[in-house]
Amino acid sequence: MAAKDVKFSRDARERMLRGVNILADAVKVTLGPKGRNVVIDKSFGAPRITKDGVTVAKEIELEDKFENMGAQMVREVASKTNDIAGDGTTTATVLAQSIVQEGHKAVAAGMNPMDLKRGIDLAVADVVATLIKNAKKIKTSEEVAQVGTIAGNGDSSVGSMIAEAMQKVGNEGVITVEEAKTAETELEVVEGMQFDRGYLSPYFVTNADKMVADLEDAYILLHEKKLSNLQAMLPILEAVVQTSKPLVIISEDVEGEALATLVVNKLRGGLKIAAVKAPGFGDRRKAMLEDIAILTGGQVISEDLGIKLENVGLNMLGRAKKVSISKENTTIVDGAGKKAEIQGRVAQIKQQIEETTSDYDKEKLQERLAKLAGGVAVIRVGGATEVEVKEKKDRVDDALNATRAAVEEGIVPGGGVALLRASLSINAVGANSDQTAGISIVRRALQAPARQIAANAGAEASIVAGKILENKGATYGYNAQTGEYGDMIAMGIVDPVKVVRTALQDAASVAGLLVTAEAMIAEAPKKESAGGGMPGGMPGGGMGGMGGF
């Protein structure tokens, strides 16, 4: 086991505080509409330029082990806030730095660290309750756009694009952000259910120009296993032919004789048909087939359920207004499923999302939910260079997460005003003077984000904070973009309450632990062994004996 280096009390806390300050000072320059960018060196490729707090925090690794511990704890604040709320990482870092600094002073003055932490926790719980009580629910698309604009660093095109996407796919719909191949940023919406499987044979194509198979008012046969023998399918194929409606077969695979016969029938014009593979694998495939069945009002033909293919009737097939199949994707628009059943399935998937602990499973369930509930919107972020595209994509991601959070829990005045106001209304009472000091630490920390936003905009932080607090209006604040004071909500400067709340809770949680640390242990640096030269005392001569080649 390697030797360890141990630091105690004041020495430990001071080193840790240095680490906290280095990381927080690098992150906090990005806060607010006039926050600056940070350039991050990459071992390969061009440097990355970003204004995203968590991206900056994740890049910082310090040489001194003890300073690094402090920095990593604050990095954890930013990451945790990002995971839960998706935005507010810089605010969380600024709050954590302030709590650690004030806490360090209090401990140095002889106060009890555990009581300070209890006081911090009391104050935070009080502030969170105040924030939730004062939150305003989002009702209009304009309000969604405002949240997106603020989180997107004042870029109104980002805000309006996210608002449009949410309007089209609903609040439950999936909105993904991708890098575009062009300079333009555009929004593409796929309505209905789309999955990433295309036609099994190009002979199924109905539109040769676009190479897609469009089938209107189609029947949909959902089969769990492979189809290789056509004999079992004949009864249902004959029934579909008589209705003169098209048929889409979705199964694990269609191969051999079955596929050849379907293609021949399609080419002869007797049967409008297309076959695609079922999406997903294993249990997820079963679940997705079940989703399609509920969406289209059909039934999955599965031997587990005792249903044989030869016994299938038209009433077991799904229906859809339109099925569009390209080489890579299949889209089912306007399925004939019952509303109540679809809503029941949506509720079931939501329940699974809450219960699962795996991020991967959560993401896949979220995709399934979106396909059932609304649709999928893709925002393709463009720019002149790769560096610009990456920087803009960071902002669009933040804006998207912020708008989702705003729709979920509502909004409060932005620009750090909600926290600044909350500092005046903390009613928590400490059991002793040290706990009261902990409450005061939070009261001071709550002013830090508003002060930092003002400082980044070139204003005098103390004057701005004082002027906001002089005015009794709950939504009165400072617009750092224009340098004016006024009603923040009327000016469209709003923050999602979930983001503000999460930032404060995560910052206080980690900062409270840092304040209570009394000893720190790190691996001792390895001493360089003395003596140079070549290993094993090999003589430094040449390889003369190897001549003659």
UniProtKB/Swiss-Prot annotation:
CDD domains: GroEL. Its EC number is 5.6.1.7. It is found in: Cytoplasm. Gene3D superfamilies: GroEL (3.50.7.10), GroEL-like equatorial domain (1.10.560.10), TCP-1-like chaperonin intermediate domain (3.30.260.10). Together with its co-chaperonin GroES, plays an essential role in assisting protein folding. The GroEL-GroES system forms a nano-cage that allows encapsulation of the non-native substrate proteins and provides a physical environment optimized to promote and accelerate protein folding. Pfam families: Cpn60_TCP1. Forms a cylinder of 14 subunits composed of two heptameric rings stacked back-to-back. Interacts with the co-chaperonin GroES. It catalyses: ATP + H2O + a folded polypeptide = ADP + phosphate + an unfolded polypeptide. ATP binds at T30, L31, G32, P33, K51, D87, G88, T89, T90, T91, G415, D495. One of its GO terms (biological process) is protein refolding. This is Chaperonin GroEL 5. It comes from the Bacteria. Keywords: ATP-binding, Chaperone, Cytoplasm, Isomerase, Nucleotide-binding, Plasmid. Belongs to the chaperonin (HSP60) family. HAMAP family: CH60. InterPro entries: Chaperonin_Cpn60_CS, Cpn60/GroEL, Cpn60/GroEL/TCP-1, GroEL-like_apical_dom_sf, GROEL-like_equatorial_sf, TCP-1-like_intermed_sf. The lineage of its organism: Bacteria, Pseudomonadati, Pseudomonadota, Alphaproteobacteria, Hyphomicrobiales. GO terms for molecular function: ATP binding; ATP-dependent protein folding chaperone; isomerase activity; unfolded protein binding.
